[in-house]
């Protein structure tokens, strides 16, 4: 399933990435701009998720009253809660499942693009890419940690293109090889080679990427925790919430020592943009503002129904 999703979304995202790279001449800047475009495109989904979260907060008070009323009858309580959700037009799709699913699908596509920088940016033909893959099979078999699997052979190729220049010249034209060499030389961030995997046992400048990835993830997680604690104090008391707050940064730190630096740079960019987006939606679509707007809309709808009913009764009397 994962491979199918990646195979579907990656080609869609690789075209704009290639165009942005041709315009900027910087791979990292191209990733940054593409991620911004995707965040903007998904903003309506994020806003909907924020509004549904606010609506859920408002419904929690009614749900708690139902549970207290039917404390000795869990089946009846669940029936009443479901009836409440139906009246409010609130279902599983509104609870964040659908928006999160959409974002996850796009994220998988982005990961696919990150693991295939050559085919995504330079857009070599599938025949050339397959020939290059066979050349890099030897690197993968040697256990090069930058080519742990066939999924990362393109990143390994960027690191080892000089070593395999002779074999590559047999499958690539002089122009293609020149493009590959130029791209490999630009495949850097702050002077760090994006094809290199940071070594947890060997302190170096590459440690900067895992540290930044962890710190940016931690800031975003703490902000979300404080936000949830304010909106739903009862949920915040759940020990799992505190655990998840630090689990994500810890996993981010661990994984960035397992994957090439380029993947870690993408995570840093994504963490920063997600944090900015969280602040924006929390300010513009704060729960208080959303709930107030919902109450106004419900009042208008209720009065409209009352007026319609009143007119119908008056017409029936005539």
Predicted regions and their residues:
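Helix-loop-helix
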Residues: 1-318
């Amino acid at each position: 399933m994962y491979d199918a999703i990646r195979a579907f979304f990656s080609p869609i995202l690789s075209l704009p990435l290639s165009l942005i790279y041709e315009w900027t001449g910087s791979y990292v800047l191209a990733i940054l701009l593409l991620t911004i475009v995707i965040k903007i495109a998904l903003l309506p989904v994020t806003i909907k998720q924020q509004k549904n979260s606010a609506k859920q907060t408002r419904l929690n008070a009614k749900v708690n009253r139902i549970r207290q009323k039917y404390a000795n009858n869990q089946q009846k309580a669940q029936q009443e809660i479901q009836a409440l959700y139906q009246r409010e037009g609130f279902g599983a799709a509104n609870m964040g499942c659908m928006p999160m699913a959409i974002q996850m699908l796009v994220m998988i596509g982005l990961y696919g693009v990150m693991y295939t920088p050559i085919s995504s940016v330079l857009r070599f033909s599938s025949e050339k890419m397959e020939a290059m893959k066979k050349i890099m099979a030897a690197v993968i078999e040697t256990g090069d940690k930058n080519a742990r699997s066939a999924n990362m052979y393109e990143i390994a190729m960027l690191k080892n293109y000089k070593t395999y220049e002779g074999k590559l010249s047999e499958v690539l034209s002089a122009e293609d090889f020149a493009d590959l060499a130029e791209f490999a030389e630009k495949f850097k961030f702050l002077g760090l080679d994006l094809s290199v995997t940071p070594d947890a046992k060997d302190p170096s400048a590459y440690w900067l990427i895992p540290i930044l990835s962890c710190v940016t993830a931690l800031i975003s997680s703490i902000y979300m925790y404080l936000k949830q604690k304010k909106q739903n104090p009862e949920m915040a008391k759940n020990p799992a919430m505190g655990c998840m707050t630090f689990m994500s940064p810890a996993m981010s730190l661990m994984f960035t020592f397992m994957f090439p630096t380029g993947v870690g740079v993408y995570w840093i960019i994504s963490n920063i943009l997600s944090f900015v987006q969280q602040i924006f939606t929390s300010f513009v679509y704060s729960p208080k503002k959303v709930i107030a707007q919902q109450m106004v809309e419900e009042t208008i709808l209720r009065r409209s129904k009352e007026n319609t009913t009143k007119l119908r009764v008056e017409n029936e009397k005539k």
